[in-house]
Structures are given as C-alpha cells and as structure tokens.
Amino acid sequence: MKKILFAAILSAFSCAAALAAGDWANFGRYAEANKAVSKPPLAVLMGDSITDAWPKKTPGDFFAKNNIVGRGISGQVTSQMLARFRRDVLDLKPKYVAILAGTNDIAQNQGYIAVENIFGNIVSMVEIAKANGVIPIVCSVLPANNPWRQEIKPAPLVKKLNEMLKAYYGKNAVKYVDYYTPMADDKDGLPKKYANDGIHPTPEGYAVMEKILLPALK
C-alpha cells in the first residue's frame, strides 16, 4: 500500500513539475472559486467537460442544494486531473470525491495513452483521496461510439476501461457509480435524448446522472 501511495504521489509531483513553462493542468481555473468555498462541501465532482458543463445545464440547482462543488475542466485528461487533485479536491476537505474521467484520454487529447494507464491515473486519485480521509467514488465513463478521428474506435475502449474500474471497486471496497448501463443505447453510445452530440449530456441526461449519483453520497 505504501508503495502504491508513493507511486501515486510521485506521479502527481511529476505532473506538477511539468507545469514550469505554463499552467498545463489549469490550476488557475478554480483558484478564486476555491478561495471562496466557506465550508467543506459534501462532495467534489472531478472531471472534464461533462462535469464542467453540469452546473450550467442541471435543472433544480442540484449543486447548491446538495452542497456539491464541480471541478471539471473541458478537454482535460486524467494526468491533468491528477496534477490538480490536491488543489481542487483535497484542499476543499470534502466528504466525498466523485471521479468521472477518461473520455479525453480515449480521444487522445494529449496523445495516445493505453487504457491501463488511464485506469492507473484514476486509481492514483482514488488512493490519494483515501490517504487523506476523503471517500472516493469511481464513476463509469459515459457511453461513446462516435469516433473523434477515424482511427479511434471509442466504444470498445470505454467498455474496457469501465470493466477495469468495476473490477477494481469490487476488490477494494470503493464506491462505484454506474452511469454507463442505464444510459447506453444498443450501439454502445448515448441516445440523442441524453446527448445531442453523442458526448455531452443534455439536461435530461444530467437528470439521470443525478438520480444515480445521489444515493452514493449517503
């Protein structure tokens, strides 16, 4: 366990070291918002554009009503989230962190990365959360079957990553939230009612996700 934690912390430190020439992990995005957090949130949602857009599209003020803080950044991959995990999650002292990540890694936003390494970055965030008294919730990646580039076939990669995450939760007593199963269509993608572009949820899609997530925050 100590070796795993050391590797996770070393990985995060290495990512931070890469920021010397610029704000690669976008620490600045939530710098002021983090200062304005006056009490520990029930949960922080860590993620990419799916999480980033959630507060703007959610009906009924889901975030404020449940003391949830969103820390998604559009376009980010798991290594960037790992680099800013302390600043945007641990420093806020939440009870829970829900990690929804991996779509942009599969899309190769920062270049090719094996599914095993995407999984490893997510596990590193989980281990760091646990070591700091924050309860991690691993979220399945949402369905995706529209290729960003012709050579990328996302559907089988999403399914493989989700299988790895589900197996990890089963062996490590970590909470797991399955968005994939109730939202996937018969082509392993998101139907139009849940995502007009096949990736980013509609208000109806977010409403489904909220009903799935809330029971895990108990």
Protein language model features and the residues they cover:
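Catalytic His-Asp segment of secreted/periplasmic serine-dependent ester chemistry enzymes
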Residues: 9, 13, 18, 142-218
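Serine-esterase "nucleophile elbow" of acetyl-processing enzymes
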Residues: 19-96
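Cell-envelope and extracellular/periplasmic
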Residues: 71-74, 101-106, 110
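Positively charged n-region of N-terminal signal peptides that target proteins for export
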Residues: 1-4
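Charged helix-capping and loop-helix junction motifs
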Residues: 114-123, 154-162
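Active-site segments of SGNH/GDSL-like serine hydrolases
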Residues: 100-106, 125-158
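Charged, glycine-enriched surface loops/patches
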Residues: 115-139, 168-174
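Extracytoplasmic/secreted cell-surface and envelope-processing proteins
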Residues: 106-111, 115, 146-149, 186
